[in-house]
Regions:
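FIC/Doc superfamily catalytic core
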Residues: 1-246
Length: 246
């Protein structure tokens, strides 16, 4: 049994991975937001039970991220996931409730800045045109859903469409498109945070120059997930690695 270099595993297995590892995905996303919850605490919250030892805001953040994943999985199961503005806004409302104060329920209504980089996101007045441009670029990649998904994540993070929760929303949208196309979902782990932020900040400042570096990082995280599910990556050629199941 083999999968191509895009991480194709089929829709059913891709969705099963997201369902089975939902607590892990929620935990990873929360950790990247500097949430101090442990994995057992996150798993308990995901299962619907309250835990002690966390602040109200940390507990709420975990619950919000979990609701975002629940909504995505349900949309995928019912075949209603789409890359559009309405879906994106709905996911952002779920993951950023009580955190987004710059136009909650829509695109942000004020300028924002990003720490650690000299890059300045587009003004809020240009966000609709930026979104339309992103959709057009995604449509050009219909035949390459992996690249399409990675571009969606990168540009949603770079444009900062929302007042908060941008990367969380982008991760949901990226994974929705991956899973919908039968590709293995991606989670970004805290252990690789420095590599992630270095690659992402490079993309912020010079997308064309750092696109390969950032996309390769995301592909490596996908390969890590594939290996976790028993897939072995064999470099048959430099341009077309083949992934096989043990």
């Amino acid at each position: 049994m083999t999968a191509d270099s895009n991480g194709y595993v089929g829709f059913d297995l891709a969705l099963f991975i997201a369902e089975k590892l939902r607590a892990q995905f929620v935990f990873d996303m929360a950790q990247m937001e500097e949430n101090t919850a442990t994995y057992p605490q996150v798993e308990t919250i995901v299962c619907g039970t309250s835990v002690a030892g966390l602040s109200v805001s940390e507990t709420r953040q975990i619950d919000n991220i979990n609701r975002g994943w629940q909504a995505l999985i349900e949309d995928l199961r019912l075949k209603r996931f789409q890359i559009n503005k309405l879906v994106t806004i709905e996911y952002n409302k779920l993951v950023s409730e009580s955190e987004n104060r710059l136009g909650f329920g829509g695109f942000r209504n004020a300028p924002v800045a990003i720490g650690g980089t000299s890059y300045t996101p587009p003004t809020h007045l240009d966000l609709n045109s930026c979104w339309d441009e992103l959709i057009a670029r995604c449509q050009e990649l219909e035949d390459n859903p992996l690249e399409q998904s990675l571009l969606l994540y990168a540009e949603m993070a770079r444009n900062q469409f929302f007042g908060d929760g941008n990367k969380r929303t982008a991760l949901l949208m990226m994974n929705g498109n991956l899973i919908q196309n039968g590709l293995c979902p991606i989670t970004i782990t805290k252990s690789r945070e420095v590599e992630y932020r270095t690659a992402l900040n490079g993309y912020y400042e010079s997308p064309e120059q750092h696109r390969i570096q950032f996309f390769d990082f995301l592909k490596q995280e996908q390969q890590t997930m594939l290996k976790r599910w028993g897939y072995e990556i064999q470099d048959v050629s430099k341009s077309a690695p083949v992934i096989t199941v043990k």
